[in-house]
Regions:
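Accessory "access/gating" subregions that flank catalytic or transport cores
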Residues: 1-47, 116-130, 138-139
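Extended C-terminal regions of large enzymes
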Residues: 44-49, 202-219, 231
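Short glycine-rich loop/turn motifs
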Residues: 30-32, 54, 133-138, 146, ...
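Internal maturation/activation junctions in enzymes
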Residues: 66-153, 165-166, 173, 280
Length: 313
């Protein structure tokens, strides 16, 4: 009945959905991608999502000694994220249409080669444009299972199209396609677009540590990287890792900084060639959640940038 309602509405409003589209669609169990980072195993969803950007950046950062409040550490993280996003936007698409396998991008040898590009100055490279988002993330656990879950209809109310009588707002993930000729993510029939939603999961010494995630469109992989660095490099607890001030790479090679990042760090980054500015809107820097299993206890943390909370019952 729901499928019929969708089809009738699509036909009445000039939509392109067909019965064959709905019949061909099915959820998929996928094998997550992972990398080892300084004692943690970091798990992310594979393409057609942007989880690979998190792992690419961490592979680059593995070769650096990162320290809290060290301006150089900010520079290195920003450059690693820019390189990771450049690869992600160029190669990630529906996995049936990708030119490179994720394993090739995530090889440690490739990371070592790319790491040499990170020097004493900001790289003169422009990233593709970002787009707005509308995403919800939650992490949950009990005595037996742990879940990292994310859902998004993309821009606010998605397409803005509500199917009468259903309460369902249709998403507009088709906006994630490219129109560039020859790009693996170019729009086409039966293809799935590049998308932003990436629930994460961490393990230590082969044992599950717990789910984590950061809502926020193209801030998601950047938030994941900064949370993992806080945990693995700086030894922070989950709440402190979420609380820590963040940066974000945005279009035009600009870097946004939260007000909590010291002025001296901003000046240092400017001297290295970064275009930085402070942004007071905390919602732009993602909203995260974490649940970890520590021994017999579960530890929850919630980002102060949103109205979420850690709740036990």
């Amino acid at each position: 009945a729901l499928a019929e309602a969708l089809l009738r509405f699509s036909e009445a409003t000039g939509g392109l959905l067909t019965r064959e589209d709905l019949e061909a669609h099915a959820p998929e169990w996928v094998t997550p991608l992972s990398t080892e980072y300084k004692g943690l195993t970091v798990w992310e969803l594979p393409p057609n999502g942007q989880g690979v950007a998190v792992l690419l950046a961490l592979n680059l950062l593995e070769g650096f000694d990162l320290r809290p409040e060290d301006p150089w550490s900010y520079h290195v993280q920003i450059e690693a994220m820019r390189l990771a996003l450049a690869d992600t936007y160029r190669f990630v698409a529906d996995p049936r249409h990708m030119e490179l396998a994720p394993a090739a991008l995530l090889s440690k040898a490739y990371a070592a080669e790319r790491r040499r590009l990170i020097g004493e100055r900001a790289l003169p490279r422009v990233l593709p444009g970002l787009r707005p988002e509308g995403t919800v993330y939650l992490a949950a656990a009990d005595g037996e299972v742990m879940v990292s879950l994310i859902q998004s209809n993309y821009q606010g109310f998605g397409s803005g199209v509500l199917v009468p009588g259903t309460g369902i707002a249709l998403q507009n993930r088709g906006l994630g396609f490219s129109l560039e000729e020859g790009h693996p993510n170019r729009v086409g029939p039966g293809k799935r677009p590049f998308h932003t939603i990436i629930p994460g999961f961490l393990a230590r010494e082969g044992k599950p540590l717990g789910p984590f995630g950061v809502m926020g469109g193209f801030m998601q992989p950047q938030g994941h990287v900064q949370v993992v660095v806080g945990l693995a490099d700086f030894g922070l607890n989950p709440q402190a890792a979420l609380d820590r001030p963040r940066w974000q790479v945005v279009p035009g090679d600009e870097v946004l900084l939260e007000p909590g990042i010291p002025q001296a760090t901003a000046l240092f980054l400017k001297d290295l060639g970064h275009r930085v500015r402070y942004e007071a809107e905390y919602g732009l820097f993602g909203r995260g959640q974490v649940v970890f299993r520590l021994g017999e206890a579960l530890v929850g943390a919630s980002d102060p940038r949103a109205e979420g909370l850690a709740l036990a019952w």
